[in-house]
Amino acid sequence: MQDDERKETWDEFRGLVNMSPAELEKWLASEESQSAGQHKDGGESTGHASGRRILDILRTNKGDLSDDDYQHMRKVVGYIRRHVAQRPSGDVRDTRWRHSLMNWGHDPLD
């Protein structure tokens, strides 16, 4: 990945991932987090696994991020954009929609 692509990816990722590492870590430990999203074979949901990966990325020095990290960041940006566009009507405070986005590091209420 070229430097300009990395910069664009970083900027988009940091613009959409609006939860701090501490907030995301606390959220991922919650029952609401673990029950949100699509679970494969009764295991961890895709979003929850992504949240753990996002936490690792946020805690890594920017210069130490790999191309694989940047690819995951692109995936996160795409997911958040798609799901924000599908916001349900009404109060979303305790919805699976919000909980799923929070697993991906984005709290739509912030």
Language-model segments: which ranges?
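A charge-rich, low-complexity, intrinsically flexible signal that marks solvent-exposed coils, linkers
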Residues: Q2-D110
